[in-house]
From Swiss-Prot:
Localization terms from the record: Cell membrane
Record: glycosylation sites: N153
Subunit structure and binding partners: Homodimer and heterodimers.
Descriptive protein name: Casparian strip membrane protein 2
Extracellular compartment residues: 59-88, 143-175
Cytoplasmic side: 1-37, 110-121, 197-200
UniProt organism field: Ricinus communis (Castor bean)
Membrane spanning stretches: 38-58, 89-109, 122-142, 176-196
Function noted in UniProt: Regulates membrane-cell wall junctions and localized cell wall deposition. Required for establishment of the Casparian strip membrane domain (CSD) and the subsequent formation of Casparian strips, a cell wall modification of the root endodermis that determines an apoplastic barrier between the intraorganismal apoplasm and the extraorganismal apoplasm and prevents lateral diffusion.
Length: 200
């Protein structure tokens, strides 16, 4: 009687079984990529709005000037932003914020094209925080001077000048409002960058 030899045959796993989990993982990555790309597009749009607000604030403050129609032999009554060091700081700070926001646009575009790249997001998160701090400081300082211009201070005998220089006060008040609009947009940008970085 002959002994039968047992032969073990290895059957490779079918390609459909081996790749069964791959589409699921790919779908998760695509969903995250779509979410991050949507955030990046919204980030770019908000940056354009922040640029407009910061430039508007700087240009309005920088061109604010009013001369009263009456004068004496020795005095001419004039009010301009360069009469107040705080307003000069405001113009410089808002110009710096606007310049940074313009330079940040290419990095925002990179985040749109490559939503999974963490480097541009981290850089924008850090620099947006710095710009937000500078913008808020300039806006708060200018708002204090605008308040004094409107209301004065009886304790220190500072008189309100807005009754005489109405146009000047309207211009500087508008520039302060625009600066705080830029602050709000920068706050949203920082929060969005933080949300995007959480998903990396």
């Amino acid at each position: 009687m002959m002994k039968s030899d047992s032969v073990a045959i290895d059957v490779p796993e079918s390609s459909s079984v081996a790749k069964r989990k791959a589409p699921f993982m790919a779908n998760i990555r695509d969903e995250n990529g779509g979410y991050k790309k949507g955030l990046a597009i919204f980030d770019f749009i908000l940056r354009l709005g922040a640029i407009a607000a910061a430039l508007g604030a700087a240009s309005t403050m920088g061109t604010s000037d009013e001369t009263l129609p009456f004068f004496t032999q020795f005095f001419q009554f004039n009010a301009g932003y360069d009469d107040f060091p705080t307003f000069q700081f405001f113009v410089i700070a808002m110009a710096m914020v606007a310049g940074y926001l313009v330079l940040s646009l290419p990095f925002s575009i990179v985040s749109i094209c490559r939503p999974h790249a963490a480097g541009p997001r981290i850089l924008l998160f850090i620099l947006d925080t710095v710009a937000l701090t500078l913008n808020a400081a300039a806006g708060a300082a200018a708002a204090d001077i605008v308040y004094l211009a409107h209301n004065g201070n009886q304790t220190t005998n500072w008189l309100a000048i807005c009754l005489q220089f109405g146009d000047f006060c309207r211009e500087v008040s508008g520039s302060v409002v625009a600066s705080f609009a830029s602050v709000v947009i920068l706050m949203v940008l920082v929060v969005m960058s933080g949300l995007a970085l959480r998903r990396y």
